[in-house]
């Protein structure tokens, strides 16, 4: 491959497709974690390219908390149907029985039970030995030091001090029974790369990424979009219509919007050129405590 003649986006694309094909060939039962966000959309697009004109040789897995935006659920089902993907949806039955929700139990407990434990349940249920994730190194400091092939023990835990060297695009996928690998094909992409690639490839995304007038209220320094009636307003809180969009998507009570007028992909790309903050600044779960993301990943988080 002539690296000099490839644009940086095509180099990233080629690297990601190589990783996806390597995993499909090397592991017996891989799965692609599908969170419905922009990174998942890019990863799914790359996987479809990797095996075109055939179908994906692995299913998609969505770990559902029951608190995603309604537009995300609609997009998930429409996308899986349009591309003919096998879609597995898992919701932690114990969490559902306990009535876990982010307002009553807080973001840390909600995330641990509905996302981390839910994910581990699904991986155990289907005996997946490799799981693709859409995490990128530029998102957050614990992800910055994680390998593309992220080794997990039989309890799905990550030990940042026990990572394997990855030299010259050679990946060590050797695991023992019960162990697994999380694989991050987008590790070397930036948020700007993701948006430029979405524009270049005309990839469909959830409309929440584009600015529009939406009902929001300010709570704990975050602009919370009110997506349904499962919220009790606190004294003095007022729901107002404001021009906002989302840089990252998750559970609607835990994902802050940003004020923006970017209604098209070129406008988002232009906005990113002058941005000085991480896209995850609106994620409440990242602020639960110092080193929050690394602690979650050590316990088995995405």
From Swiss-Prot:
Domain of life: Bacteria
Quaternary structure and partners: Heterodimer composed of CysD, the smaller subunit, and CysN.
Statement: the UniProt record of this protein carries the keyword ATP-binding: yes
The protein's name: Sulfate adenylyltransferase subunit 2
Pathway involvement of the protein, from the record: Sulfur metabolism; hydrogen sulfide biosynthesis; sulfite from sulfate: step 1/3
Keyword Cell inner membrane attached: no
EC number: 2.7.7.4
Alphabetized NCBIfam families for the sequence: CysD, PRK05253.1, PRK12563.1
Any one GO BP annotation for this protein: hydrogen sulfide biosynthetic process
Signal peptide: none
Family: Belongs to the PAPS reductase family. CysD subfamily.
Protein function: With CysN forms the ATP sulfurylase (ATPS) that catalyzes the adenylation of sulfate producing adenosine 5'-phosphosulfate (APS) and diphosphate, the first enzymatic step in sulfur assimilation pathway. APS synthesis involves the formation of a high-energy phosphoric-sulfuric acid anhydride bond driven by GTP hydrolysis by CysN coupled to ATP hydrolysis by CysD.
HAMAP family tied to this protein: Sulf_adenylyltr_sub2
Catalytic EC class: transferase
Substrates-to-products reaction catalysed: sulfate + ATP + H(+) = adenosine 5'-phosphosulfate + diphosphate
Encoding gene (name): cysD
Cited Pfam families: PAPS_reduct (PF01507)
Alphabetical keyword list: ATP-binding, Nucleotide-binding, Nucleotidyltransferase, Transferase
Annotated GO MF terms: ATP binding; sulfate adenylyltransferase (ATP) activity
SUPFAM superfamilies on file: Adenine nucleotide alpha hydrolases-like
């Amino acid at each position: 491959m002539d690296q000099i003649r490839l644009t940086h986006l095509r180099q990233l694309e080629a690297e990601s497709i190589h990783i996806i094909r390597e995993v499909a060939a090397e592991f017996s039962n891989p799965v692609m974690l599908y969170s419905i966000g922009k990174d998942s959309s890019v990863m799914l697009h790359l996987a479809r390219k990797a095996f075109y004109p055939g179908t994906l040789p692995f299913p998609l897995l969505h770990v559902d908390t029951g608190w995603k935006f309604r537009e995300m659920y609609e997009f998930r089902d429409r996308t899986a149907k349009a591309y003919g993907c096998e879609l597995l949806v898992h919701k932690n039955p114990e969490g559902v029985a306990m009535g876990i929700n982010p307002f009553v139990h807080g973001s840390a407990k909600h995330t641990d039970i509905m996302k981390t434990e839910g994910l581990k349940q699904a991986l155990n249920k289907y005996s997946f030995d490799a799981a693709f994730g859409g995490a990128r190194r530029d998102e957050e400091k614990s992800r910055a030091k994680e390998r593309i092939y992220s080794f997990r023990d039989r309890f799905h835990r990550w030990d940042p001090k026990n990572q394997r060297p990855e030299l010259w695009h050679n990946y060590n996928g050797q695991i023992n029974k019960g162990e697994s690998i999380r694989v991050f094909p987008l590790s070397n992409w930036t948020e700007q790369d993701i948006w430029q690639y979405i524009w270049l490839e005309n990839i469909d995304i959830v409309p929440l990424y584009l600015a529009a007038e939406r009902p929001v209220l300010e709570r704990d320094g975050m602009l919370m979009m009110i997506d349904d009636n499962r919220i009790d307003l606190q004294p003095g809180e007022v729901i107002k219509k404001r021009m906002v969009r989302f840089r990252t998507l998750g559970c609607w009570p835990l994902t802050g919007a940003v004020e923006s007028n970017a209604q098209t992909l070129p406008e988002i790309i232009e906005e990113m050129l002058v941005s000085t903050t991480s896209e995850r600044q609106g994620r409440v779960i990242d602020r639960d405590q110092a080193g929050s993301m690394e602690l979650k990943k050590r316990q088995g988080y995405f």
